[in-house]
């Protein structure tokens, strides 16, 4: 069994405080998986431009620790006995189409104060400056909306407080605190930019930049699963690797790195998103078959064994394969079948025969079953930079040969 790494603000493996309540359940679920369960695992496919509300499997949120959950900069929450449906009375500014949207109205309800973050006052959203547009993704506990804040396009994530379950509400509050604390302290060109957050009695709200290009998975789907041009694929892979090198350098783990959570900016650069709250559904509802995350998940996470930052490296290997091939990983399997094949038969995606050797080497090292064999992201960045140089050099040589083959002309 692997020993979880010791991080300043992160507990890993089976030591998550939030894992204890459902550990037995997940073990039973894995037992069924190990017996060859053929449950449907189709993803919700709710990729978005500011995060994701798709569900995943082993997802105590990024940076989970008592120190982070109990951060002194986070206000205690007052509890109200109202539901979202009961709260809507005097809305703030929403589009006409959202008049019947209870979550949006609950956020804008002026009868209740906006609760922000002490010591993080600059991150507390001023709802007077927030204009909400249509929802573009949703899950069991919330929705994602496009909107504007101070005139800037933003993605607005709203999570609903469970009405009749204090335990679920407490857990979701912890997840909200963790994601806000993470995003407020992560500043990198390849990390989705955090704009602010707030609470209302019935909802939590997180606002991030809006990535107009959608997710990498949506991009590949629009291309009808055709491979991304190699130069662009390597550039985007480098964006992800650099962002993750930064995240790991801050002693955090993402835990749900996949193409759904990689957002494309207007300049085609990649932004890593989804650092916590979007993955609350599994722990609040128990292990669920409605997830596609198994396709990217490291075997030690699938088996609920102790893990460390190398789970993100494994997932990156799968993402790199996606960019190179344009295909959905294990597309001929359900996600549960893929998980079974990965863990019990060592199956991995097939590397194309014409794949650049350096890229093939990166993929296979990243998704090695042994986490100790997987490179760190700092090394991955160096390897991809070498691949990028090789691709550019080859292209220049090809252009030079083309020029030599053309007859000389005199003007």
Swiss-Prot record:
Keywords: ATP-binding, Kinase, Nucleotide-binding, Phosphoprotein, Serine/threonine-protein kinase, Transferase, Tyrosine-protein kinase. The active site is at residue 256. Autophosphorylated. Changing residue 265 to A: Slightly increases kinase activity. GO terms for biological process: protein phosphorylation; regulation of embryonic development; seed oilbody biogenesis. InterPro entries: Kinase-like_dom_sf, Prot_kinase_dom, Ser-Thr/Tyr_kinase_cat_dom, Ser/Thr_kinase_AS, Ser_Thr_protein_kinase. Changing residue 315 to A: Loss of kinase activity. It is an enzyme of class 2 (transferase). It comes from the Eukaryota. The modification Phosphothreonine is found at residue 288. Its EC number is 2.7.11.1. Residues 130-392 form the Protein kinase domain. One of its GO terms (molecular function) is protein serine kinase activity. Changing residue 259 to A: Loss of kinase activity. It catalyses: L-seryl-[protein] + ATP = O-phospho-L-seryl-[protein] + ADP + H(+); L-threonyl-[protein] + ATP = O-phospho-L-threonyl-[protein] + ADP + H(+). Pfam families: PK_Tyr_Ser-Thr (PF07714). Transmembrane segments: none annotated. ATP binds at residues 136-144, 157. Belongs to the protein kinase superfamily. Ser/Thr protein kinase family. Serine/threonine protein kinase that phosphorylates proteins on serine, threonine and tyrosine residues. This is Serine/threonine-protein kinase STY13. It comes from Arabidopsis thaliana (Mouse-ear cress).
């Amino acid at each position: 069994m692997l020993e979880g790494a010791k991080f300043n603000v992160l507990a890993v493996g089976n030591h998550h405080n939030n894992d204890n309540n459902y550990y037995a359940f997940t073990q039973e679920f894995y037992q069924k998986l190990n017996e060859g369960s053929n449950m449907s695992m189709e993803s919700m496919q709710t990729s978005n431009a500011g995060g994701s509300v798709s569900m995943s499997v082993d997802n105590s949120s990024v940076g989970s620790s008592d120190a982070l959950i109990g951060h002194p900069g986070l206000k205690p929450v007052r509890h109200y006995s109202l539901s979202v449906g009961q709260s809507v009375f005097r809305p703030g500014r929403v589009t006409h189409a959202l008049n019947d949207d209870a979550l949006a109205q609950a956020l804008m309800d002026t009868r209740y104060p906006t609760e922000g973050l002490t010591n993080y006052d600059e991150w507390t959203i001023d709802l007077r400056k927030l204009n909400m547009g249509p929802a573009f993704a949703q899950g069991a506990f919330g929705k994602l909306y496009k909107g504007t804040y101070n005139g800037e396009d933003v993605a607005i994530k709203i999570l609903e407080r469970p009405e009749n379950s204090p335990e679920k509400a407490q857990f979701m509050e912890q997840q909200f605190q963790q994601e806000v604390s993470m995003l407020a302290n992560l500043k990198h060109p390849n990390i989705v930019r955090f704009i602010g957050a707030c609470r209302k009695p019935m909802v939590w709200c997180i606002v991030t930049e809006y990535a107009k290009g959608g997710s990498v998975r949506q991009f590949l789907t629009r291309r009808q699963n055709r491979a991304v041009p190699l130069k662009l694929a390597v550039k985007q892979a480098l964006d992800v690797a650099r962002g993750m090198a930064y995240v790991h350098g801050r002693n955090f783990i993402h835990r749900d790195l996949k193409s759904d959570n990689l957002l494309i900016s207007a300049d085609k650069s990649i932004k890593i998103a989804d650092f916590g709250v979007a993955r609350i559904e599994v722990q609040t509802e128990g292990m669920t078959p409605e997830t596609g995350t198994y396709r990217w998940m490291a075997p030690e996470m699938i088996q609920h064994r102790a893990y460390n930052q190398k789970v993100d490296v494994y997932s990156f290997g799968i993402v790199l394969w996606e960019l190179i091939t344009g295909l959905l990983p294990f597309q001929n399997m359900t996600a549960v079948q893929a998980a079974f094949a990965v863990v019990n038969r060592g199956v991995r995606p097939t590397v194309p025969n014409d794949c650049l050797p350096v890229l093939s080497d990166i993929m296979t090292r990243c998704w090695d079953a042994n986490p100790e064999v997987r490179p760190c992201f700092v090394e991955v960045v160096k390897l991809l930079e070498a691949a990028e140089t090789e691709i550019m050099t080859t292209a220049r040589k090809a252009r030079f040969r083309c020029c030599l083959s053309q007859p000389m002309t005199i003007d």
